[in-house]
């Protein structure tokens, strides 16, 4: 099928290796140069955070998003005639709007990085097109909008539709001029619609949307901003955390249809995911003289400390390094040091989140809305409750055993080591008692009491 350049700019014919080469940031080994422990910890954190390793999920999402945008372009401006007609129309995109894409996931799984990667892939071509009467039109496949500077429409859109705006901001930074006058909302929306059509910009992606959730009126404000940008014409892709999506679910049905009917969820690593192994290997390569764990062997333990979330993995490793350097320590990080970091004050916030995530996964009940996916499960852990429970119980038992072991004297520890194999061989398997669901009767309670007496 022959496509116009407006739709072809979203063709995604790259192999996995080509995607990795274009958007990946390989690990760079740190050179310490005699820095003290505090500086080393900062260098380590920066080095770990800079690693971008595309995985199977990331590549699939990039291809899926590009395909959705290409379909949008094909349905709106594939023929030159329809495109030229739109150039002279006040409403080039028409009145119908496709549902926005709600891109969500746990904080720290890599959503912002994926949007930046998508922007890099689409903008790398730098193509132009020509149609009858119009030559050398720049194709701008995507607007990447951020709320870091504010949530006003001038702050969000002006730099994309008014080239003079960025020049004015640069001059303000140099104290050479005053701030340019803001456009009215109708004016900026009208210009945004026409500029996006002219440059065949079929995707408007909003990142850093968590900035808008700080106010008490976040629900109404977020919906208003999203609906205004959604009404421009390009396909809207907005990155939102779970808490905001829960708030948007309370909006009227027409708002939910526009903003929540097309969700895409980015999930954390699973406990035995090969991509987690590859990611851990990349992190080890940043400081192989520091990290002494084996990624393939120890990744399940690391999953138990982090729930497979990239940001938490990095923060755990940095916290473990800081702790092991205290008092002139050796600065080596293995699983025991990560376990110490997990229990420390440096990782307390993450530890609370991880424990809530595991409990929610097993119980199926909401404890914290900002950690509960509004659209379904977020994990790559199998949904089998027995397996998930076993993972959590193994983790809790391991932590308890370590605490008990640390409290023993050297003599007691040697005695425990001598008894441990024999104890393991003689241990009897636990007995699981299954209780019938339903309302308990007096007879049930009496029977249960008799059973407990026999067991005791």
PLM regions and their residue ranges:
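Walker A/P-loop nucleotide-binding motif
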Residues: 93-116
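Walker A/P-loop-proximal flanking segment of P-loop NTPase domains
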Residues: 1-99
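The catalytic "switch" region of P-loop NTPases
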Residues: 193-202, 211-215, 219-297
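Mid-core helix/loop region of P-loop NTP-binding domains shared across ATPases and GTPases
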Residues: 78, 92-96, 152-218, 228-231, ...
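C-terminal alpha-helical "lid" subdomain
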Residues: 2-33, 198, 270-277, 281-456
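A short hydrophobic beta-strand->loop->alpha-helix junction that borders the nucleotide-binding pocket
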Residues: 104, 142-151
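Post-Walker A helix-loop "phosphate-sensing" segment adjacent to the P-loop in P-loop NTPases
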Residues: 121-133, 167
């Amino acid at each position: 099928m022959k496509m116009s350049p407006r739709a072809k700019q979203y063709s995604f014919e790259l192999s996995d290796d080509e995607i990795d080469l274009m958007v990946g940031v390989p690990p760079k080994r740190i050179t310490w140069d005699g820095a003290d422990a505090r500086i080393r910890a900062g260098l380590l954190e920066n080095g770990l955070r800079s690693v971008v390793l595309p995985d199977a999920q990331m590549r699939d999402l990039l291809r899926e998003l590009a395909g959705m945008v290409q379909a949008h372009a094909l349905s709106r401006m594939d023929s030159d005639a329809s495109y030229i007609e739109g150039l002279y129309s006040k409403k080039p995109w028409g009145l119908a709007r496709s549902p926005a894409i709600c891109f969500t996931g746990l904080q720290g799984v890599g959503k912002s990085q994926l949007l930046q990667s998508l922007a890099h892939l689409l903008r790398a071509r730098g193509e132009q097109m020509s149609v009858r009467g119009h030559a050398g039109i720049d194709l701008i496949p995507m607007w990447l909008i951020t709320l870091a500077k504010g949530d006003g429409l001038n702050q969000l859109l002006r730099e994309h539709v008014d080239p003079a705006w960025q020049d004015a901001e640069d001059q303000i930074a140099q104290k050479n001029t005053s701030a340019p006058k803001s456009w009215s909302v109708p004016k900026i929306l009208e210009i945004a619609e026409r500029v996006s059509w002219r440059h065949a910009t079929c995707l408007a992606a909003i990142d850093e949307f968590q900035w808008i959730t700080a106010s008490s009126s976040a629900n109404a404000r977020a919906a208003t901003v999203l609906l205004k940008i959604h009404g421009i014409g390009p396909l809207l892709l907005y990155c939102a955390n779970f808490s905001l999506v829960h708030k948007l679910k309370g909006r009227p049905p027409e708002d939910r249809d526009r903003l929540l009917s097309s969700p895409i969820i980015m999930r954390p690593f699973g406990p035995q995911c090969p991509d987690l192994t590859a990611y851990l290997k990349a992190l080890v390569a940043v400081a192989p003289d520091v990290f002494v764990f084996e990624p393939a062997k120890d990744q399940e333990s690391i999953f138990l400390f982090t729930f497979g979330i990239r940001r938490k993995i990095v923060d755990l490793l940095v916290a473990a390094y800081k702790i092991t350097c205290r008092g002139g320590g050796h600065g080596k990080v293995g699983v025991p040091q990560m376990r110490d970091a997990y229990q420390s004050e440096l990782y307390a916030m993450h530890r609370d989140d991880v424990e809530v995530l595991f409990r929610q996964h097993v119980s199926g009940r909401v404890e914290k809305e900002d950690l509960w996916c509004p659209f379904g499960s977020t994990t790559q852990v199998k949904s089998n409750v027995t397996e998930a429970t076993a993972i959590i119980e193994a983790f809790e038992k391991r932590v308890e055993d370590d605490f008990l072991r640390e409290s023993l004297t050297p003599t007691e520890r040697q005695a425990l080591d001598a008894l441990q194999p024999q104890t393991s061989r003689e241990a009897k398997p636990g007995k699981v008692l299954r209780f019938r669901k339903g309302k308990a009767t007096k007879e049930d309670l009496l029977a249960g009491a008799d059973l407990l007496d026999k067991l005791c």
